[in-house]
UniProtKB/Swiss-Prot annotation:
This is Uncharacterized mitochondrial protein ymf33. Keywords: Mitochondrion. It is found in: Mitochondrion. GO terms for cellular component: mitochondrion.
């Protein structure tokens, strides 16, 4: 198994209290793009296409590694789209870091608020993430 450059990582505490660690890494086998990987199980979802095009349901695979990501891709698309339009970020790693100075204004602009303790996203994402604590 090839080792890819890890750009960022974060922890989530799922609704069943299981703590999982996720990595964002460069993955040249996925269209020269990025991977979101659950280090515990080694499952990977590709984000590559969405970085070079306006994200759509066709180009943004659903994150299925954890129940908390089941409805997250639509919200991810919105944030990625905002970041694509407003920044020249090479990768959306800071998306998962509430303390990331480049990310906070974008999330606040996109959603109107940022909660430092919980993932609070609109629609189905908000419902799924209401009990998901960011424990990094």
């Amino acid at each position: 198994m090839k080792k890819f450059d890890i750009l960022d990582f974060f922890y989530i505490k799922s609704q069943d209290t299981q703590i999982l660690r996720y990595y964002i890494s460069k993955n040249p086998t996925n269209y020269g793009g990025l991977s979101l990987t659950n280090g515990a199980e080694g499952k990977t979802s590709t984000m590559a296409k969405s970085l070079n095009t306006t994200p759509t349901l066709d180009t943004m695979p659903m994150f299925t590694e954890d129940v908390c990501f089941a409805a997250y891709s639509i919200d991810m698309q919105k944030i990625l789209h905002n970041m694509k339009l407003k920044t020249n970020l090479e990768y959306p790693g800071l998306l998962f870091d509430h303390e990331g100075p480049d990310c906070l204004p974008l999330i606040k602009e996109a959603y109107g608020f940022v909660d430092k303790s919980f993932w609070v996203l609109p629609g189905r994402g908000k419902e799924l993430f209401k009990d998901v604590k960011k424990v990094r």
